[in-house]
């Protein structure tokens, strides 16, 4: 059983009992998470598609931890100008455990 859920404007595939890597969430929301913006639910081949969301559906999750992704390095070099720029960025993600999908 899996569901497509919209969290902070992005869509994720949530499977019961598995971890979900989402963009970092605020500390206020970190206790028990419930998302009701479910776009699609698939249970044993039976598919429910929302318009835009599935009515009376919910995904319950548990917050686990925040982690940083690998560093992405951006480098710009301008020839003949003695100009170069190097910038690094590490995106922070939250890992949540999908407890159950209710519909």
Curated annotation (Swiss-Prot):
Keyword Ribonucleoprotein: yes
InterPro entries cross-referenced by the UniProt entry: bL21-like (IPR028909), bL21-like_sf (IPR036164), Ribosomal_bL21 (IPR001787), Ribosomal_bL21_CS (IPR018258)
One Gene Ontology term from the biological process aspect of the record: translation
Any single GO CC term annotated in Swiss-Prot or TrEMBL for this entry: ribosome
Endpoints of the signal sequence: none
GO MF term set: rRNA binding; structural constituent of ribosome
Protein family (similarity comment): Belongs to the bacterial ribosomal protein bL21 family.
Function comment: This protein binds to 23S rRNA in the presence of protein L20.
Name of the protein in question: Large ribosomal subunit protein bL21
Naturally occurring in which organism (per UniProt): Borreliella burgdorferi (strain ATCC 35210 / DSM 4680 / CIP 102532 / B31)
Encoding gene per record: rplU
């Amino acid at each position: 059983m899996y569901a497509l859920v919209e969290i902070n404007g992005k869509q994720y595939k949530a499977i019961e009992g598995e971890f979900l890597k989402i963009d970092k969430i605020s500390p206020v929301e970190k206790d028990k998470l419930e998302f009701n913006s479910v776009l699609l639910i698939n249970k044993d081949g039976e598919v429910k598609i929302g318009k835009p969301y599935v009515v009376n559906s919910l995904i319950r999750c548990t917050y686990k931890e925040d982690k940083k992704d690998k560093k992405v390095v951006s480098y710009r070099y301008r020839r003949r100008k003695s100009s170069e720029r190097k910038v690094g960025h590490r995106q922070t993600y939250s890992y949540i455990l999908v407890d159950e999908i209710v519909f």
